[in-house]
């Protein structure tokens, strides 16, 4: 534990801290109307070209999730290879990013200081794999969406992270929870299939990988609940 003298702020830092605390009094303001999930899914302006290729089965499930009378904080997608699970996970994440983009001072939605960074994590085994699969697909979806190009442009100079500096928000690749320590992790996608061996043999390595996926799921779920659950319920979002 640090000594009190090590935590003492200089006058300049103290002023900065007081200014940041004052920022928390600024409320998040709606700057754009949020269109219904039905309209959003059918409109290439928001979803991009992928709006035309969403299976009706998945589309109805997405509508049910966002129109549920009870808030849904977790979605588990199952099915065989090529059934669209990764694409649907990305569309759900894209919708949440879109909703957040319709507010100014996004951190204030969760009673955080304006300078606080909001983070979403995309868990995969490694960056090269992530760029070829779900994380890379999400980045392309954002870049192909006219809405995001006009109203919520990311920093295109960065590919390892999807960053909106104007909103203090990012989607970051992560291979473990150590990549999210100290952040305000509001949500995540765990591409579980990429944590398993492609062989059906149960090996010690396969068990370790499975345990890692379970650990990531448990830790991120607990962190999200502790940091955001009460704030989310009380927010206007």
Go through the PLM ranges and name each one.
Residues 1-237:
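Phosphate/NTP-binding elements of NTP-utilizing enzymes
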């Amino acid at each position: 534990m640090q000594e009190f003298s090590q935590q003492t702020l200089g006058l300049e830092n103290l002023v900065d801290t007081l200014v940041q605390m004052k920022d928390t009094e600024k409320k998040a303001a709606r700057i754009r109307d949020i269109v219904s999930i039905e309209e959003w899914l059918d409109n290439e302006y928001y979803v991009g070209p992928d709006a035309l290729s969403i299976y009706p089965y998945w589309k109805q499930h997405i509508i049910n999730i966002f129109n549920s009378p009870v808030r849904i904080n977790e979605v588990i997608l199952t099915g065989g290879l090529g059934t669209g699970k990764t694409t649907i996970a990305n569309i759900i994440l894209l919708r949440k990013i879109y909703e957040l983009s319709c507010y100014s001072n996004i951190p204030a939605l969760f009673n955080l200081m304006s300078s606080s960074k909001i983070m979403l994590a995309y868990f995969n085994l490694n960056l090269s794999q992530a760029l070829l699969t779900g994380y890379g697909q999400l980045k392309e979806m954002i870049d192909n969406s006219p809405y995001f190009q006009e109203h919520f442009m990311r920093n295109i100079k960065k590919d390892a992270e999807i960053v909106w500096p104007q909103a203090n928000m990012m989607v970051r690749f992560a291979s473990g929870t150590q990549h999210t320590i100290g952040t305000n992790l509001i949500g995540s996608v765990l591409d579980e299939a990429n944590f398993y061996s492609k062989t059906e043999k149960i090996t010690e390595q396969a068990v370790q990988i499975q345990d890692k996926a379970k650990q990531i799921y448990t830790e991120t779920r607990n962190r999200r609940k502790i940091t955001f659950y009460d704030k989310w319920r009380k927010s206007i979002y």
